[in-house]
Amino acid sequence: MKTMKKLWILMAALTATLLLCVISASACTMVYVGSDLTADGSSFMARSEDYSNGYNKIAHVNQHGKYAAGSVYEGCYGFIHTFTHDSYAYTATSDDNTSGVCPDCGQTHPHTPMEEVGSNEKGVSVSAMVTLSPNGTVVNADPMEDLGICESDMATILLSEASSAKEGVELLLNIFDTVGAGEPSGVLIGDQNEIWYVENFTGHTYTAIKLS
């Protein structure tokens, strides 16, 4: 009996120690499950955001036409995009800026902060992004662009504009080619027919792989 009591005390102490430990993470995790691994042949993509608890999340619905054709969107860090058509409706999760100040960039101009995951009315889903770390040699050869597209803006633009996963991939690659990337990224873009993984480590160099 005394042995069991000591064991429970030890377990309680270990649990308390683990709960008191603060583990700081600054990254995200994406999951892809191919059709060959599921019972019904479906493919899955998912994500978790592993970051500090100071960034509350809001799940919301963006109505069709929130961004009108020809309107200009300015993102967190200066990336600018002109919409080619009235934006598609989509659901997404973003950081909470209901106070009027973006918790990510500290700016007050209208934009959606870190809208990193969502699905639109055409069945396109985006997970943007996972954090990557390039070496200095490749970045020196092909530097990031100060006003390039960043994690904070990818899902907003792709879900508003793309009617298929492939169209979303083509749009993102065109942005990399013409405007450039503001940071390295790994992005999943999918629909009911296929899922793509797009990765860049420099401003204009990338790879796009069709996973399913």
Residue ranges and their predicted role:
Residues 155-161:
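Short, well-ordered beta-strand elements within core beta-sheets of diverse protein domains
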Residues 11-22:
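Bacterial N-terminal signal peptides
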Residues 2-12:
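Bacterial N-terminal signal peptides that target proteins for export
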Residues 152-153, 166:
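A structural signal for well-ordered alpha-helical segments within the folded catalytic domains
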Residues 28-150, 171-212:
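A contiguous strand-loop segment
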Residues 23-27:
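Membrane-interface motif at the C-terminal end of an N-terminal transmembrane signal
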Residues 161-167:
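Short, charged, surface-exposed loops that flank catalytic or proteolytic processing sites
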